[in-house]
Amino acid sequence: MPANAHDVERIETLIAYASANAEAYREAANDAEGFRAAAPLAHRAQERQAVAAHLQAYLRAGPADESSGDLTLRAPVVAVRRAAAPTDAEVVEAAVRDEGELQAAFEAALDDRALSAPARETVLKAYVAVRTGTDQIRDLRRALRDGP
């Protein structure tokens, strides 16, 4: 098990954020009109679910049993704002806004001096995947805004 109750509380909060973000991305992918936006949004949903699973595995097994594989290769509180028939650009814009909240939660955990070293390593690995996904969604937003 993790080193202390503080680690568990912090990681459970991140699991909730990542799970909610995954669900928001699934909904956004369903709302998207074209493959150009739907596919990357669905991929982000899978990645966010992988982040949540990574953190859950840490809580179940503890740091000694955690695999050291690259989290991004294991691709399997946030809400997409719904509107009537949103455009792909609007759907992606909502996802980008939600990314900021998720990223801030991970950054707060990494800044937490009370977090144990094994928990911090687990959170950092998940944060790298979150940050990469954030950058890719922002790139998609720019591409949709700037046109084909």
Predicted feature locations:
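Membrane-interacting alpha-helical segments
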Residues: 1-8, 75-88, 140-148
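Alpha-helical bundle segments that constitute or directly flank the non-heme di-iron/ferroxidase center
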Residues: 2-32, 90-114
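Alpha-helical scaffold segments that form or flank carboxylate-/histidine-based iron centers
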Residues: 6-14, 33-54, 88-92, 117-132
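Charged/polar positions within long, soluble alpha-helices
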Residues: 23-30, 53-60, 85, 104-111, ...
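Sparse recognition of residues in long alpha-helices and their boundaries
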Residues: 27, 34, 57, 63-64, ...
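Conserved alpha-helical segments that form or flank metal/cofactor-binding pockets of metalloenzymes
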Residues: 39-73, 136-144
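Carboxylate-rich helix-loop segments that flank metal/cofactor sites and access channels
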Residues: 57-103
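Preference for long, well-ordered alpha-helical segments
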Residues: 98-148
